[in-house]
Amino acid sequence: MFTLEEANAALTALRPIVERMVQHRRDLTAPQARQTELVTRIAGNGGDMVPSDLQDLAETIQREADAISDCAEQINQAGAQVKSLEEGLLDFPAKRGEEDVLLCWKLGEEIGRAHV
């Protein structure tokens, strides 16, 4: 469980990890779209396709996915929860009185609110 002060202090270490995670997610989008396009082409007739293209894309996708997983694992080990890869949204478990809540933080913003 985090206090607001502890969550803010944790952001010092977590912010660069979240920034990397969001960037890796962005870097994953184009190769995934291209892979879908190639798979569709293969299902048709495979026309004008270089076989190594699909392998290269698969390797790029795996590399980016692994990097995202590594970032998420570091965040989880610090006690925070990843809620959105695209937005860099984290929750920090906390208490408000006797109630369990989550302190919500989005990359580029301050910890904004608590929710159940």
Describe the predicted segments one by one:
Residues 114-116:
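Conserved small/polar residues in nucleotide/adenosyl-binding loops
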Residues 1-41:
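Long, hydrophobic N-terminal alpha-helical segment
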Residues 98-99, 105-108:
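Core subunits and conserved enzymes of cellular information-processing
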Residues 71-92:
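Long amphipathic alpha-helical coiled-coil segments
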Residues 30-66:
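Structured domain cores in non-transmembrane regions
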Residues 14-31, 57, 61-64, 68-71, ...:
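Amphipathic alpha-helical coiled-coil segments
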